[in-house]
From Swiss-Prot:
Its cofactor is Zn(2+). It is found in: Cytoplasm. A motif ('KMSKS' region) lies at residues 254-258. This is Glutamate--tRNA ligase. The lineage of its organism: Bacteria, Bacillati, Bacillota, Bacilli, Bacillales. ATP binds at K257. Its EC number is 6.1.1.17. PROSITE patterns: AA_TRNA_LIGASE_I. GO terms for biological process: glutamyl-tRNA aminoacylation. Binds 1 zinc ion per subunit. It catalyses: tRNA(Glu) + L-glutamate + ATP = L-glutamyl-tRNA(Glu) + AMP + diphosphate.
Length: 491
């Protein structure tokens, strides 16, 4: 490929599912590469496998790409001169090219049934041979083909893979990669219904759309020699290929959609209240790293820095802890009003806050969220973080460590004195609560952990949490007094 050729890259999803982490990373790296080089980022929908297409799959993919912060220069919703941008609308482009290969003797009709092909594969496996098509129909005469069709057989079209060739390409990530043509076998380029297969349609589309670089996952690397053979058959120049290493879980296994230990779909992160900028940041570091130790960057900084030479040759580890840390860095920078907006739907969904808030309730939610602003990693996390504010006194239970603290002889005296102090307060505000705790210290002679821990455990139900006077203010007089009453009655 010429060095001066305009950079044009594509993300080409199939609408057979929703946008997951792996595909989002592919889209993101192509987006960054295009923007870094002032090139074009194209969205092409590869929807030829109609049986597997999911309703709203295409719309959902594009909605979530936009939510992550990506825009594109051409696509189904951004017309350009290289359209149509859905493969299902490009059949009239593929058909004459398939016919051209047939006419030139570079492809042939195959009448083998699925049963015959399966039997062939099983026989090869039994002989410890690599399963590949034997070429059974490669030399059928026109008369034999006509006889098959007269019998009602519909042909698929297979590409004639040349024998004894080494197919080599320089990969942006893996450097020089080679495949032997003898290990490939004649592959199908058009199915029996005339619809082109993935490898044929992709090669044709990438050429006609003038795609300069194909940056995709490592799981596509075995497709590359087939696509290069198609390029060569037409006398076209292949794009530059780059195959990113796969994303693995903590067990170093490839991410699987069935792996429940990791949330994999962007829509789910969106629903949980993750921030798009944070997810963009996290995904951009999955298998790519800048110079230095810094890990938090803006989209503009990523665009400026992105260099495919810094793509890792080792699998990218999906680290849940790192993801929550990254999102927390972004949440901490948000104004409190934005964090409340992020949190409120989750509190309402949990049924702990009413759907139709009045101003007093909204003010209370602001106070509640402010206690966890620095700690929160995503919107939905406010629910488990703040559950102590909604528990009934009778439902509060204590673990063994908390029970040990509450078993000290001075605890009933401390709790009784603190209850008396709060009952005397006209306004339950943090400053007044703090002063009340000091008076309890003076009255009882108990100080330090012996004073604070019992008060915290009885009033909040937890040994650790937000600053105690603030937590008690947000809990409110009625709830705090009720919890102390309940504990004193039971002890």
């Amino acid at each position: 490929m010429s060095e001066t050729k305009r950079v044009r890259v594509r993300y080409a999803p199939s609408p057979t599912g929703f946008l997951h982490i792996g595909n989002a990373r592919t889209a993101l790296f192509n987006y960054l590469f295009a923007r870094h080089n002032d090139g074009d980022f194209i969205i092409r929908i590869e929807d030829t496998d109609a049986k597997r297409n999911v309703a709203d799959g295409e719309e959902s993919q594009m909605k979530n790409l936009k939510w992550l912060g990506m825009d594109w220069d051409e696509g189904v919703d951004v017309p350009g001169k290289y359209g149509p941008y859905r493969q299902s609308e490009r059949q009239s482009i593929y058909e004459p090219l398939i016919q051209q290969l047939l006419d030139e003797g570079l492809a042939y009709k195959c009448y083998c049934t699925e049963e015959e092909l399966e039997a062939e594969r099983e026989k090869q496996k039994a002989n410890n041979e690599m399963p590949r098509y034997s070429g059974k129909c490669r030399h059928l005469t026109k008369e034999q083909q006509a006889e098959k069709e007269a019998q009602g057989f519909k042909p698929s079209i297979r590409f004639k893979v040349p024998a004894n060739e080494t197919i080599t390409f320089n990969d942006m990530v893996k450097d020089d990669v080679s495949f032997e043509s003898n290990g490939i076998g004649d592959f199908v380029i058009a199915k029996k219904d005339g619809i082109p297969t993935y490898n044929f349609a992709v090669a044709v589309d990438d050429h006609l759309m003038e795609i300069s670089h194909v940056l995709r996952g490592d799981d596509h690397i075995s497709n590359t020699p087939k696509q290069i053979l198609i390029y060569n058959a037409f006398g076209w120049e292949p794009p530059t290929f780059g195959h990113m290493t796969l994303i693995v879980n903590e067990s170093r296994r490839k991410l699987s959609k069935r792996d429940g230990s990791i949330i994999q779909f962007i829509e789910q992160y969106r629903d949980l209240g993750y921030l798009p900028e944070a997810l963009f940041n996290f995904i951009a570091m999955l298998g790519w790293s800048p110079e230095g130790e810094e890990e938090i960057f803006s989209k503009e900084e990523f665009i400026k820095m992105f260099d495919p030479k810094r793509l890792s040759k080792s699998p990218a580890l999906f680290d849940n802890v790192k993801l929550t840390w990254v999102n927390n860095q972004y949440v901490k920078k948000l104004p409190l009003n934005d964090v409340v907006e992020l949190s409120l739907p989750h509190l309402q969904k949990a049924g702990v806050v009413s759907a139709d808030l009045d101003q007093a309730e909204l003010d209370w939610v602001h106070k509640l969220v402010s206690l966890y602003h620095e700690q929160m990693s995503y919107g939905a996390e406010i629910v488990p973080l703040s559950e102590m504010f909604f528990a009934d006194a009778e439902a509060i239970t204590f673990d063994e460590e908390e029970k040990a603290v509450l078993a000290e002889d001075t605890v009933p005296t401390v709790i009784s004195a603190f209850k008396k102090e709060l009952e005397a307060l006209e306004v339950l505000e943090a400053a007044e609560v703090k002063a009340a705790i000091k008076r309890v210290q003076k009255e009882t002679g108990v100080k330090g952990k012996g004073l604070f821990m019992p008060i915290r455990i009885v009033t909040t139900g937890e040994m650790h949490g937000p600053e105690l006077p603030l937590a008690i203010e947000v809990l409110g007089r009625e709830k705090v007094l009720n919890r102390m009453d309940t504990w004193l009655k039971n002890n």
